[in-house]
Amino acid sequence: MMSGEVMLVILIVIGLIGRSPIIATAASILLVLKLTALERFFPTVERRGLELGLLFLTISVLVPFASEKISWKDVTPLFTTVVGLTALAGGAIATWMNGKGLDLLRSEPHMIVGLVIGSIIGIVFFRGIPVGPLMAAGITAFVLKLWEWFGSR
């Protein structure tokens, strides 16, 4: 079986070759923690890392409100235009799918491995941005449900 260090080095190389600084940096930080005997922080990082990442993502998205680049005048069209209503629906659907993804991960936690590898493939080969393992799980849950509906017919 491949050791954690080797896997992290492989991820660093994949990140560098694929021009994905996020993967390379994340794997590098984990490798440093592992090599400096700070592995005791892994459970905390695993448990709280996603929350912290989402917190910073949300902060970055809300900066235009705080800096007053977006005003109430800009928010009103959300409720009166097709684009605005579609954005609201998209947000609601994404949130619902995240919930389905969480349900899937709770019932089948081993799927996280496929989601991580799929995310790496998406980052490296499709220039994707890894913002949501829950969304990836939600999409997986949706596709599995479609498979269940149409595959059984």
Swiss-Prot record:
Subcellular location: Cell membrane
Transmembrane portions of the chain: 6-26, 52-72, 77-97, 111-131, 132-152
Pfam families (UniProt xref): DUF441 (PF04284)
Topology relative to the membrane: Multi-pass membrane protein
Entry keywords, A to Z: Cell membrane, Membrane, Transmembrane, Transmembrane helix
An annotated GO cellular component: plasma membrane
Family: Belongs to the UPF0756 family.
PANTHER family xrefs: UPF0756 MEMBRANE PROTEIN YEAL (PTHR38452:SF1)
The name this protein goes by in its record: UPF0756 membrane protein BBR47_23170
Organism: Brevibacillus brevis (strain 47 / JCM 6285 / NBRC 100599)
Classification of source organism: Bacteria, Bacillati, Bacillota, Bacilli, Bacillales
